[in-house]
Amino acid sequence: RMDPRLFNVSTTAAPTKEELGFHYLWRFYKTLPKNGHITIYDRSWYGRVMVEKIEHLTPDYRTNQAYEEINGFEKSLIHDGLFVIKYLIIINEEEQLKRFKQREEDPMKVYKITDEDWRNREKFSAYDDRMNEMVNRTSTEYAPWILLSGQDKKAARIKVLEHFIQH
């Protein structure tokens, strides 16, 4: 059994003014789980090599350096006794469009879709390229990516839960 009081979900938005004054990984140290607890990241330090690369927010040499920093960060977490499990749920462009339209049409979900989502959708190919590079450069023996098809949202969620429970 898992006690929900031991779970925390950490969402990652754009860095604050304070966070910008530090190394980009600094803000994640504050969200690491306590001993016996679990933190689930909705986005994470991978924004450095995805969003920041695509939006040209970080110079290319720093983005490339980030891959080594991320691998080192995850290795240090594991050496400190944390488990790092990385899931990447992948959908194709058609499925994304279908979900966007459903959100716009459903009054209970319309808040989930923004102009920024549509703007980013125009960069689907760039995100796909960055995603492939990210997986290739950060799937390590100690912290491999678990890649799952997200075409069927419910099935993907079940697969994540099944895998998580086994580990």
What is each of the regions a protein language model found here?
Residues 33-35, 80-82, 141-142:
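Short loop/turn elements that form and flank the Walker-type P-loop nucleotide-binding site
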Residues 73:
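Phosphate-binding/switch loop-helix module in NTP-utilizing enzymes
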Residues 129-167:
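NTP-dependent small-molecule kinase module
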Residues 51-69, 77-129:
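A glycine- and Lys/Arg-enriched "phosphate-lid" helix/loop adjacent to the NTP-binding pocket
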Residues 11, 39-42, 84-88, 147:
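A structural signal for short, well-ordered beta-strand segments and their strand-loop junctions
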Residues 1-3:
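A conserved segment at the C-terminal end of the G1
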Residues 15-18, 44-47, 90-97, 117, ...:
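Conserved nucleotide-binding/hydrolysis micro-motifs of P-loop NTPases
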Residues 7-67:
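Conserved nucleotide-sensing/catalytic segment adjacent to the nucleotide-binding pocket
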